[in-house]
Swiss-Prot record:
Name of the protein described by the UniProt record: tRNA sulfurtransferase
Lineage start: Bacteria, Pseudomonadati, Pseudomonadota, Gammaproteobacteria, Alteromonadales
Annotated Pfam families: Rhodanese, ThiI, ThiI_fer, THUMP
The keyword ATP-binding belongs to this UniProt entry's keyword annotation: yes
PANTHER family: TRNA SULFURTRANSFERASE
Family: Belongs to the ThiI family.
Length: 484
């Protein structure tokens, strides 16, 4: 069993040297991700495709491989195939017949062939021959070239025949690290998660900068979002998560800054700080989730004033997106429920915010800040490898327990993603098991029976510890981590 990875069309349009570099990078990225699923994963680069071989003795890995390939930037689509050898067109037909006889019985069908290599036949001739044979010697209703109920997809390469059993849509975009690094400002809300994802998809190694305005609970929630984005879409490369203690800045804004200017001043202070951090990391651009007109600080006038605080390039991928479109994308990438449970701190800064800030007035207000405020904040910022988020949970989870046995009145919550749970269902005799995906737990936990104790389960124990710590910070103490 194999997967044939088809490159995103924009890659195919590049010059030969660039195309070669992008393809090599994608091959490396795929190998890095799949090796974490199984060390025996084999990846082979060809000119216009990449072959992924499922170990012959481990066919059960096909689903896991397919799920990971669907989340790697730079892939247009993936086809899962079974490989055969052939000597003639009739040999192709004879091998297709037993595979599709039952699948097309009582249905309309068509045959589609893609061919590479030197042969004494073309693709259309194979389609006609195989289609005619299936039509004559099966119980199919007949051939329908437009909108058939079953499409028999075949790929021919040299003397190899590939029967397509499944097609998986890819992310598109460019392979990770083919573009330069960016620093994404992440708050855990709808917008910043989507803007970060957009740059991951575009092939930029996306580091995260979090301005902590709400204490440990806020930081834990945002780390979950960043970790989810990295683990799902950017796992092939290491990135940093930078936490900036921004409460002193907020305190000075509330004490010293004119009420109407607070929102714009806050954003300018964030941009200044992020620019300093980005320069230290050798990064040339900041990414934000701002969308035109969404809030008072995001008018064109105010965005212009905000940009004047730094020479650093500020990128806003969501600038023309509607809020509902952002929420829909948030739902698709799996960060919606995180965002729903995330408090919005910036919105309470100013009671009467200006929508047409004047640069001179804003700069005059900023002279009221302590001279070394930004320096102190930058020095106090903590940067970690995003993989350390999981390790941190092992040391910070002291308020709860990790258990291997289940007592009476304890309920296990399987927090794995639905596809993981379906692939390896958790079954424990005599124990009640609830299935709540981790991205819905924050919003659904309050509805559970408070008289019971809940044991959170995931396969590696990383997300269960993150979720347990988050729930404890919210005031729930009837939660533990289950590690059988």
């Amino acid at each position: 069993m194999k997967f044939i990875v088809k490159l995103y069309p924009e890659i195919m349009m590049k010059s030969k040297p660039v195309r070669m570099r992008f393809t090599k990078m994608l091959e490396t990225n795929i190998r890095n991700v799949l090796k974490k699923v199984d060390d025996d994963a084999k990846v082979q680069r060809q000119w216009d495709r990449i072959m992924v071989m499922v170990p012959k003795n481990k066919p059960e890995l096909a689903q896991a491989f397919g799920e990971r390939l669907a989340c790697i930037p730079g892939i247009a689509h993936v086809v899962q195939v079974d490989e055969y050898s052939f000597t003639s067109v009739d040999d192709i037909y004879q091998q297709v017949l037993p595979v599709y006889r039952d699948q097309i019985a009582g249905k309309t069908f068509c045959v589609r062939v893609k061919r590479t290599g030197s042969h004494d036949f073309n693709s259309i001739e194979v389609e006609r021959y195989v289609g005619g044979g299936l039509n004559q010697f099966t119980d199919a209703i007949g051939v329908r070239l437009k909108n058939p109920e079953v499409t028999v997809n075949l790929e021919i390469e040299g003397d190899k025949l590939y029967m397509v059993t499944k097609r998986i849509e890819g992310l598109g975009g460019f392979p990770m690290a083919t573009q330069e690094d960016v620093l994404s400002l992440i708050s855990g809300g709808f917008d910043s998660g989507v803007s970060s994802y957009q740059f991951i998809k575009k092939g930029a190694r996306t580091h995260y900068c979090f301005f902590n305005l709400g204490g440990a609970q806020h930081e834990i929630g945002v780390k979950q979002v960043a970790y989810h984005l990295w683990k799902t879409f950017g796992e092939s490369h290491k990135v940093k998560f930078v936490s900036v203690p921004f409460e002193p800045v907020v305190a000075e804004i509330l004490e010293k800054i004119d009420n109407g200017q607070m929102g714009v001043v806050l954003k300018r202070m964030m941009m200044r700080t992020a620019a300093r951090i980005a320069e230290r990391m050798g990064i040339q651009a900041i990414v934000t989730g701002e969308s035109l007109g969404q809030v008072s600080s995001q008018t064109l006038t105010n965005l212009n004033v905000i940009d004047r605080c730094t020479d650093m390039l500020i990128l806003r991928p969501l600038i023309t997106m509607d809020k509902q479109d952002i929420i829909n994308e948030c739902r698709r990438i799996g960060t919606e429920d995180f965002a729903k449970s995330m408090p919005e701190y910036c919105g309470v800064i100013s009671q009467k915010p200006t929508v047409k800030a004047v640069l001179a007035k804003v700069e005059a207000e900023e002279t009221k800040f302590s001279e070394d405020l930004i320096d102190r904040i930058v020095e106090q910022a903590v940067a970690i490898d995003i993989r350390e988020i999981a390790e941190q949970m092992n040391t910070r989870i002291t308020e709860t327990e990790t258990v291997v046995a289940i007592d009476t009145n304890e309920v296990v919550i399987d927090i794995r993603a639905p596809e993981e749970e379906e692939n390896k269902p958790l079954e424990i005799e005599g124990v009640e098991i609830k299935r709540i995906p981790f991205f819905k737990l924050a919003t659904q936990f309050a509805d559970l029976d408070k008289q019971k104790t809940y044991l959170l389960y995931c396969e590696r124990g990383v997300m269960s510890k993150l979720q347990a710590l988050y729930l404890i910070e919210q005031g729930y103490h009837n939660v533990k981590v289950y590690r059988p």
